[in-house]
Amino acid sequence: SDFYYLTHFPEPEAVVVLVPGREHGEYILFCRERSPEKETWEGRRAGLDGARELYGADDAFPIDDIDEILPGLLENREKVFYSMGRDADFDVHLMGWVNEVRAKARNGVHAPGEFVDLNHMLHEMRLFKGADEIKLMRRAAKISSAAHRRAMQVCRPGKMEYEIEAELWYEFKKGGSQFPAYPAIVGGGANSCILHYNENNA
């Protein structure tokens, strides 16, 4: 959710890089390119132009080119702000890119010497809400409230858990929500005593 908070970019296989003071723009997005064949089956993609035009990226590159481009963005930077440990595979890639930059030390290129945990900084930022965020949160609360009222109205003996869950999701979608902020816990009978029950299949 931190990636979405920073970019509002909804597609998979994407990486955001923020480079303070970069001449060609500070907000860089690596993402999938447009592909008519794949979009026929998987849905539309923003592509590089969409990343810039729709999501405000200063620069956008194909995700397949990240190994060639990202090491250059790390050159002569003192620090890397990153959430280490969240994605083990990406951690390995990042360390590989940093080592690639270190290998250029004889040419006068400096690698970042410090990693700073991004989680703390981002979560601190997210504590403070702007007017637009507050408006959005109020709207989300109204949608959630309507969905829970609907779930309570349809709840009857003999009703299956998944039927009640479906009513909840229906109301979320009807209210304009793209996806739920939390999983549904719909437990009947003995399942109602399980705190984080989410099978919802009885």
Residue ranges and their predicted role:
Residues 179-192:
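Short, basic/aromatic beta-hairpin or loop at an interaction surface
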Residues 3-4, 69, 173-174, 196-200:
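Generic recognition of flexible, low-complexity loop/linker segments
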